[in-house]
Every structure is written in structure tokens, then in C-alpha cells.
Amino acid sequence: MADPGGRFRRDYNRANFTFKHGLAGNTLFELSALAALARRGGALGPHYWASGAVPAGGGWSDGTVGRQTLPDTITNIEHNDSIVILRSVEQDPMFAPLLQNLLVDIVELTGERMRADVAAGEVAVVLNSPERITPYHMDADPAFHLLIAGEHAIHVFDHADRTLVSARELEDFYAVGRRRAECRPGRLNDSNDHELLAGAGVHVPGGAPHWAKNHGQVSIALRVSYVLRSVERLRTLHRFNRRLRRLGLTPAPPGVAPWRDRLKLAAANSFNALRASHGGAAGGRQGPVWRPPK
């Protein structure tokens, strides 16, 4: 990967943009190899797969009942109107050398602003049947989508537009983990539209609503995402605000008053430490995790 225009450094987590990569046609990502990956299991997962037509405004639970096994869904994906997301593929021994280097390369391209903020990273392989729609949704963490095979369109909305996603909806998103987003009536066309061919990619900032439409072939893509310390702080603030709201208060959204945010973070961290000392539930992903080299 290269960044001759400097967009990785300039626009990372601020704006969506396209880029080129050299993974198109890589034989590691042929369907037979991915079906074998699904059968191996190991430290990967939890995976997601669903079959059957879903509209742009549909939900992630649609099509998860009565589906084929994961390996069979991958093998027959040309004909079964499915989406498959294989998670934590950077932990598989066959894929680790390539994908863990990719995680490092993107951080290096993006520079110190990202490097100082990254706590962990993950690579998912995303497969789509011809004409398949990925529903409108948001992800908290910034991501880089790299198309390896096929053609599809991805539609990305402005992550800072509070007329699309209100402050209260953001609180629900971060505090509850509600990944699905509700698209405002008449706003589906207010996106930046990117038509991707194999060898192209797009960066989606954290919190940016987006949806995708595959074209006439099976598509295979990578979703490279990063857990950021700044996003974890934001999530903590939204959860703290939610507790205050339950007490009948009306807290200011994060970012309005930085000094209040600092007080909330200190209080939340003290509460979480006390809870952990008394055997409270621990958060975070289970299993091996990629972390940036020192």
C-alpha cells in the first residue's frame, strides 16, 4: 500500500476516502481456502453469516435462522444470497504473516496521530453473494475496507452530521452497543458513494453510518479495524451520561465541556476499578488480540 496524496495522515478518522492496495487476486482468499479457514476455527470468531434478501434499512438478525453451516455457506455463496464475516483472521497461522503486517503498515502510513491512539487491531474477511446488500449501520472503530475480488458500491455518510445521528442516538450506540442505525427518511442519498473494483479500498471513520451494495459477482474484502483509546474514553463518557440520565439529570454530550469530561472519566474509572475488585464483569474481547509493536 502507498499514500502518494497523503490522505491517510490528513483524513484518517476525519473523512472517508479511497485508496489502492496490492491484494487483489491473492490466492489466500479463494473460496476453498476461506471455507477451510472456517472449518479450522481456532482463536477466530465469533463469525457472522446470514442468508436471504435484506434491504438497506434491514437488521443484522435477518437471515440468521435456517441458514447453512458456515463452510457450506462460503462454498455456495455465489448462489445463496448470503453475507459472511470471518473475524480475527489475523490470528490464523496461515493468514497471520500477511494480515499482521497489513495492520502495522496501515498504522505506519497514517502516522503518529493514529499510532499513539491504537490499543489493538483486527482483520475480518467479508464475503458477499452477487447483488447482496449490507444494511445501513455504524461501527465505533475506524476501518479500512480492502476489496480483493468482485465489485461493489459502498455509501458512507458524514460521521459528524448530528442531523443524521443525534447526540442521544450516539449515546445509545456507545452505551448499549446498538450497532444498527436508523436512516432518516429521505436521507439515504446523502452519502459519499464509492464504486470499488478489486484492488481498491475505502476508509470509513468511526461512527460514520454506511451501507453497501454488491454487484454481479461474489465479492471478497478485508475489513481492517482498530480499537482506539480515544473511542474507549468516548464509550466510557456515554455510559456515564446514561447513568446520570437514569438519575434524572441532563448531562452534556462528550466534547461540550472538556473539564466535565475529565471529571466523568475519573469517576467512571474509579467506579469500574471498585467493581472489578469486587468481582464485577470484565469487558473486552476474549482470546488472542493483535497489539501494535512498541
Over which residues does each language-model region extend?
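Catalytic core of Fe(II)/2-oxoglutarate
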Residues: 185-244
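N-terminal accessory scaffold of Fe(II)-dependent oxygenases
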Residues: 1-174, 221, 227, 231-294
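Double-stranded beta-helix
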Residues: 149-203, 208-209
